[in-house]
C-alpha cells in the first residue's frame, strides 16, 4: 500500500491511485550493468548481430583498419579511448547500412615479448635456449596476451571479427610482409650500409625513431675543449696577416698559439673525433683568452663564451668559415691529426662555439659531413656501449657509465678542458628499457626514403586528416626524416631474408630468393628461417651452392611488421577495402604506424593505404597528469566497468559509462578521466536511462499499429516535439558524420534533460497519468513517445549500445526487428519537419522558464510548494511573446495546448488588471509575471486546484474534469 493510499484511508478519503495510468515497464531504473551487459552481448552473439549484421548490409564497404596494439600487458585507458572510438564509428556505419567488417589486430613480435620470455627463465634455462625455442615461447606468450586483451575488448561491447583477428605472427601475415619487403628490394628501395643509427646498449639492437622517447629531466656532462692547431692553410695565414695578425710557422709554437674550440654534450665520442666542422658563411674570430693562446670561435658568440668560460676573450681577428677549411689540428688525447672541414646549415651560433666536433660514426650530420669529405666511419663502441681498442687508453669504459668522467679527467690533465658544466636537454631513450640510447655506426639494412619521399608527400595531400594539424605533422616528419633503419639484432621477429657469401660477404637478395622464402613462410611461418639450413632456404637454382652462403640473423623492425598490415589484411581479406576508409590511432602514430604504413604502401603501390586518418590524444588524470603507478593515479577501465575492491569508492559503472566518457571528450587533444568525471558521467547516464524508462513505462498499453494518432492530427505541443526531435536527429547525424562525438554527447544530454524531461514530459504528466487510457490527449502523447523512444534507442546505439538494446528489448509492443541495430539509423519522416513551430514555442519556453523562476522564489520563502498551488497573471511585453500567445490560442488543441497546462499552474490570467494580492512578481523585457496562491480546492486525483471540487456527490474530493475521466475510464475498460 502506498503512502498516499494509507493517508487517504486514515482520513476516510477514497484513494484514486488505481485510477491513474502509472508506469509499467521491465526496463529497470538501475542498469545493473555487471549482470545485464553480458546478457545483451550474449544476445547479440546468439543472434549473429555483432558478427554478421555488418556483412549483411548491401551498402558500400566501410573499412576501419585496426592499428594493432602490442600483445603485452593489461588494457589501459588509452586502449579504451582508441577501441571505443573505433567501435562507435563502426556501429554507426552498420546502422547506416554500410558493409562493415572490422578485423582486430595485434602486434606480436619485438623485444618486450622476448624480454618477458627471458625474464621467466633462470640462468641455466637461458643457456640452453636456442633461437627456435625462444621463438616458440615468445609466440605462446603473445597468443596468451592476445586472448586476455580480446576478452577485455569484448566486455567493452566492441564488435569485431574475433574469430579471425590478424596477428603479425601469423604465417600468412609474415608472408605478406616478406612480399612487401621483396617488392621494395626489387624497386631499389632497400640497401645495406654502415651508418650511425639509434642504438640501445640496454637492448643491444638498433632502434627506429618511433621506438624512442624523450623523458623530461635528462642531463648530460657538456664540455668545451681546445684542439691545438698543427698546420694553417696559406689563404688563412694571408687573411690574418692582412688584419695584422701573424701566426708562428714552427709547429710547437703554433699549437701553443692557436687552438680551435669545440663544445659537445657527449664527451665519450671524442675518441672517435675525425674532424671539426664549420659553417662556411659564418664569421669566426680569433680571440685571446689571456693564457697566451688564441681560440677560434664564432664571432657572434664571443660575449656569451666569455661569460661561460669565465674569462675575458679579446678579439684579434675575424675570418669567414670558408677560410678555416684545411686547418689541421691535433687530437688532445690521441696521437692523431685531423682537418677542419666545411659542414652544413646545422652549424649555427645558437649554442656551443660555432665549431662542431665531428665523429662520423656517432651522428647523422657528422656522417654526412664525413662522407662529403671522404672521412672514414670510426665507431670505437661495441654493442653493449663499451669503448673498444680503437679508443686507445679509454678502451673498456662504458659510454653511459664511466667513459664520460674518464675522458673529462684526461682532458683536464692534458690542459685541453676549457669548461665542464651540466646541460639539460631532450635526449632519446629506449622506449622499452627506459635507458639512454646512443648513435652508433653499424652495418644495418635501410629503406631509402629518398627514392619515394616526394611520392609520400604527394600521397599525404590526398588524405583527409582529422584534426587538420595531423597533415602538417606527418608532412614535416616525412620531409625531414632520414633513411629508415629496418634491421634489428633480435630473434623474435620476421627475418630479413638475405644470404651472405662466406668468403667475401657478398649479399644474395633477388627475386628468386625472395619468392622462395615467401613461399616457405606462407607454408611454415617465419620459424622456418631458424628451423632449416641454407640447403632448404635457398631456391633450387642455388642448392648446389648452399655451402657458400650463410643466412642472415637480423629481423625486421616491428614498425615494418605493423606497417605492412595493409598488404596482409586490408588488401587480402574479404569485405575489406584498400586503401582503407579510415585509420584511427593516437597522435604519436604520426611517427609510428601512420608513417610506416604510408612509406611501405607508397614504396610498393604509389599511394597511401588510407583515405582518412583520425588521431586522438592521450588519457590523463583529472589534474592533467600522465597516469603512473608511482603517482597512484592510474584509472583501470575494467574497474570502471566491474567496480573495485571497495565498491562504495569504486562502484561498477558498466561499459556504457566508459563508452559515454569516450563520446563526451574532445579526443583531438589529451583527455582527462578520474573519479569526479566518472560520477558526472554516471549522472548523465542515469538521466538518459530515466528518460528512456519514463517513455517506455507510459507505453505499456499502447500499440502504434492500432492506437497511433496521425502526425497531422497531433496537438501543437506534440508536433513541436517531433520537430525538435527532427532537429536534434539532424545535428546528431552531422556529429557522427564529422566524428565530433562530443557534440552527440551534448545534444543527447540537452535533448533528454531539457527538451524531454524538463519540458515536454513534465507538461505531459497530467495527460499521461490523469486521462482515461484511450483519450486522444493521451494517445497523441503516447504516439510521440513511441516515435521518440525508437529513435532515441537508434541514435544512442553507437555509443550506449547496451542501453539501446535494453530499450529495444523492453518495447511493450511488437516491432519487426529483433535488435535495435537491425532497424538501421533512425530516419525522420518529412511531416515531422515544421520550422514554423520553433520560434513561437521557444518564446513560450522562455516564458515558462521565467515563471518557474518566480515560483522558485516563492518556494524559497516557503510560500508555495508544488507549482499547481499557484495562480499566475502574465502581461506580455515583447511583440514576439504576444505573437506566440496569440498563435497558441488560435491554433492549439484546448485539451493539450492550454498555456495553463504548459506552465503547470492551476489558474492563469493573461493581461487584465494587476492582482491585489501577490506572493511574488517579476518584470523584464519579456513579460510582467505575478504569482498568487491558487483559488479553490485541491483535487485529490489530478492535484489541480479547482472551484468545483466537492460539487459531485459520488466523488466529493475530485474535480469535474476527473469525474468525467472516471466515467470514460469505466466505459473504456469494459
Swiss-Prot record:
A motif ('KMSKS' region) lies at residues 626-630. It catalyses: tRNA(Ile) + L-isoleucine + ATP = L-isoleucyl-tRNA(Ile) + AMP + diphosphate. GO terms for cellular component: cytoplasm. Keywords: Aminoacyl-tRNA synthetase, ATP-binding, Cytoplasm, Ligase, Metal-binding, Nucleotide-binding, Protein biosynthesis, Zinc. It holds the Pfam family Anticodon_1. The keyword Zinc applies. ATP binds at residue 629. Its cofactor is Zn(2+). Binds 1 zinc ion per subunit. One of its GO terms (molecular function) is tRNA binding. IleRS has two distinct active sites: one for aminoacylation and one for editing. The misactivated valine is translocated from the active site to the editing site, which sterically excludes the correctly activated isoleucine. The single editing site contains two valyl binding pockets, one specific for each substrate (Val-AMP or Val-tRNA(Ile)). Catalyzes the attachment of isoleucine to tRNA(Ile). As IleRS can inadvertently accommodate and process structurally similar amino acids such as valine, to avoid such errors it has two additional distinct tRNA(Ile)-dependent editing activities. One activity is designated as 'pretransfer' editing and involves the hydrolysis of activated Val-AMP. The other activity is designated 'posttransfer' editing and involves deacylation of mischarged Val-tRNA(Ile). Monomer. HAMAP family: Ile_tRNA_synth_type1. This is Isoleucine--tRNA ligase.
Amino acid at each position: 500500500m502506498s503512502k498516499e493510499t494509507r493517508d487517504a484511508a486514515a482520513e476516510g478519503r477514497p484513494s484514486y491511485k488505481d485510477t491513474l495510468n502509472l508506469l509499467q515497464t521491465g526496463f529497470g531504473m538501475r542498469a545493473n550493468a555487471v549482470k545485464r551487459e553480458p546478457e545483451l552481448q550474449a544476445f547479440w552473439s546468439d543472434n549473429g548481430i555483432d558478427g554478421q549484421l555488418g556483412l549483411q548490409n548491401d551498402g558500400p564497404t566501410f573499412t576501419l583498419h585496426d592499428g594493432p596494439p602490442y600483445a603485452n600487458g593489461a588494457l589501459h585507458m588509452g586502449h579504451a579511448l582508441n577501441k571505443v572510438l573505433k567501435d562507435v564509428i563502426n556501429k554507426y556505419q552498420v546502422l547506416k547500412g554500410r558493409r562493415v567488417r572490422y578485423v582486430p589486430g595485434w602486434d606480436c613480435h619485438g623485444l618486450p615479448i622476448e624480454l618477458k620470455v627471458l625474464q621467466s627463465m633462470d640462468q641455466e634455462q637461458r643457456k640452453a635456449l636456442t633461437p627456435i625455442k625462444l621463438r616458440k615461447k615468445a609466440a605462446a606468450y603473445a597468443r596468451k596476451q592476445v586472448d586476455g586483451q580480446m576478452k577485455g575488448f569484448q566486455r567493452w561491447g566492441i564488435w569485431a571479427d574475433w574469430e579471425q583477428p590478424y596477428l603479425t605472427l601469423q604465417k600468412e601475415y609474415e608472408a605478406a610482409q616478406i612480399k612487401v619487403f621483396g617488392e621494395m628490394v626489387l624497386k631499389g628501395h632497400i640497401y645495406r650500409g654502415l651508418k650511425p643509427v639509434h642504438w640501445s646498449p640496454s637492448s643491444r639492437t638498433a632502434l627506429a625513431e618511433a621506438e624512442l622517447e624523450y623523458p623530461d629531466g635528462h642531463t648530460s656532462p657538456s664540455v668545451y675543449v681546445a684542439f691545438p692547431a698543427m698546420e694553417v692553410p696559406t689563404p688563412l695565414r694571408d687573411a690574418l696577416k692582412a688584419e695584422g695578425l701573424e701566426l708562428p710557422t714552427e709547429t710547437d709554437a703554433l699549437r701553443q698559439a692557436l687552438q680551435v674550440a669545440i663544445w659537445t654534450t657527449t664527451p665519450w665520442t671524442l675518441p672517435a673525433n675525425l674532424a671539426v666542422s664549420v659553417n662556411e658563411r659564418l664569421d669566426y674570430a680569433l680571440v685571446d683568452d689571456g693564457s697566451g693562446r688564441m681560440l677560434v670561435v664564432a664571432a657572434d658568440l664571443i660575449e656569451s663564451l666569455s661569460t661561460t668560460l669565465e674569462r675575458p676573450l679579446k678579439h684579434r681577428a675575424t675570418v669567414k668559415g670558408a677560410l678555416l677549411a684545411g686547418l689541421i689540428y691535433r687530437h688532445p688525447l690521441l696521437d692523431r691529426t685531423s682537418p677542419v672541414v666545411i659542414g652544413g646549415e646545422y652549424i649555427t651560433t645558437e649554442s656551443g662555439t660555432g665549431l662542431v666536433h665531428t665523429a662520423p660514426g656517432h651522428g647523422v650530420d657528422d656522417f654526412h659531413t664525413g662522407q662529403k669529405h671522404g672521412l672514414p666511419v670510426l665507431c670505437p663502441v661495441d654493442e653493449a656501449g663499451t669503448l673498444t681498442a680503437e679508443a686507445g687508453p679509454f678502451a673498456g669504459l662504458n659510454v653511459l657509465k664511466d667513459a664520460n668522467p674518464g675522458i673529462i679527467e684526461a682532458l683536464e690533465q692534458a690542459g685541453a678542458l676549457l669548461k665542464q658544466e651540466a646541460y639539460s636537454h631532450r635526449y632519446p631513450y629506449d622506449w622499452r628499457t627506459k635507458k639512454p640510447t646512443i648513435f652508433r655506426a653499424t652495418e644495418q639494412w635501410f629503406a631509402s626514403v629518398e627514392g619515394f619521399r616526394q611520392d609520400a608527400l604527394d600521397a599525404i595531400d590526398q588524405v583527409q586528416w582529422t584534426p587538420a594539424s595531423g597533415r602538417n605533422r606527418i608532412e614535416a616528419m616525412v620531409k625531414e626524416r632520414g633513411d629508415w633503419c629496418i634491421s634489428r639484432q633480435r630473434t623474435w621477429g620476421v627475418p630479413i631474408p638475405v644470404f651472405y657469401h662466406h668468403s667475401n660477404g657478398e649479399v644474395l637478395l633477388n627475386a628468386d630468393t625472395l619468392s622462395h622464402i615467401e613461399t616457405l613462410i606462407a607454408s611454415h611461418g617465419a620459424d622456418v628461417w631458424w628451423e632449416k639450413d641454407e640447403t632448404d632456404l635457398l631456391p633450387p637454382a642455388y642448392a648446389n651452392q648452399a655451402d657458400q652462403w650463410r643466412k642472415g640473423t637480423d629481423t625486421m623492425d616491428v614498425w615494418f611488421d605493423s606497417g605492412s598490415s595493409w598488404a596482409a589484411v586490408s588488401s587480402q581479406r574479404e569485405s575489406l577495402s584498400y586503401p582503407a576508409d579510415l585509420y584511427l590511432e593516437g597522435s604519436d602514430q604520426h611517427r609510428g604506424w601512420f608513417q610506416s604504413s604510408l612509406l611501405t604502401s607508397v614504396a610498393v603501390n604509389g599511394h597511401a593505404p588510407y583515405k582518412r586518418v583520425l588521431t586522438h590524444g592521450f588519457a590523463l588524470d583529472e589534474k592533467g597528469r600522465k597516469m603512473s603507478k608511482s603517482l597512484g593515479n592510474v584509472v583501470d577501465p575494467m574497474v570502471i566497468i566491474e567496480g573495485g575492491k571497495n565498491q562504495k569508492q569504486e562502484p561498477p559503472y558498466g561499459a556504457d559509462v566508459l563508452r559515454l566518457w569516450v563520446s563526451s571528450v574532445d579526443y583531438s587533444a589529451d583527455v582527462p578521466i578520474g573519479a569526479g568525471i566518472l560520477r558526472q558521467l554516471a549522472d548523465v547516464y542515469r538521466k538518459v536511462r530515466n528518460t528512456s524508462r519514463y517513455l517506455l513505462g507510459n507505453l505499456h498499453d499502447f500499440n502504434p499499429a492500432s492506437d497511433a494518432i496521425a502526425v497531422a492530427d497531433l496537438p501543437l505541443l506534440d508536433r513541436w516535439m517531433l520537430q525538435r526531435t527532427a532537429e536534434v536527429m539532424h545535428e546528431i547525424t552531422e556529429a557522427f558524420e564529422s566524428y565530433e562525438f562530443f557534440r552527440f554527447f551534448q545534444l543527447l544530454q540537452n535533448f533528454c534533460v531539457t527538451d524531454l524531461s524538463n519540458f515536454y514530459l513534465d507538461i505531459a504528466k497530467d495527460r499521461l497519468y490523469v486521462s482515461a487510457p484511450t483519450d486522444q490527449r493521451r494517445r497523441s502523447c503516447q504516439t510521440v513517445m513511441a516515435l521518440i523512444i525508437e529513435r532515441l534507442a537508434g541514435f544512442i546505439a553507437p555509443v550506449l549500445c547496451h542501453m539501446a538494446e535494453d530499450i529495444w528489448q523492453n518495447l511493450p509492443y511488437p516491432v519487426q526487428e529483433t535488435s535495435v541495430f537491425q532497424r538501421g539509423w533512425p530516419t525522420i519522416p518529412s511531416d515531422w519537419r515544421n520550422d514554423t513551430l520553433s520560434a513561437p514555442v521557444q518564446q513560450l519556453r522562455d516564458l515558462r522558464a521565467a515563471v518557474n523562476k518566480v515560483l522558485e522564489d516563492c518556494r524559497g520563502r516557503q510560500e508555495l510548494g508544488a507549482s499547481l498551488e499557484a495562480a499566475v497573471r502574465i502581461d506580455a511585453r515583447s511583440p514576439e511573446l504576444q505573437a506566440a500567445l496569440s498563435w497558441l490560442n488560435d491554433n492549439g488543441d484546448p485539451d493539450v495546448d492550454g498555456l495553463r497546462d504548459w506552465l503547470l499552474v492551476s489558474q492563469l490570467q493573461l493581461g487584465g488588471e494587476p492582482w491585489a494580492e501577490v506572493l511574488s512578481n517579476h518584470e523584464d523585457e519579456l513579460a510582467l509575471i505575478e504569482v498568487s496562491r491558487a483559488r479553490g480546492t485541491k483535487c485529490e486525483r489530478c492535484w489541480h486546484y479547482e472551484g468545483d471540487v466537492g460539487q459531485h456527490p459520488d466523488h466529493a474530493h475530485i474535480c469535474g474534469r476527473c469525474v468525467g475521466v472516471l466515467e470514460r475510464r469505466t466505459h473504456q475498460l469494459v
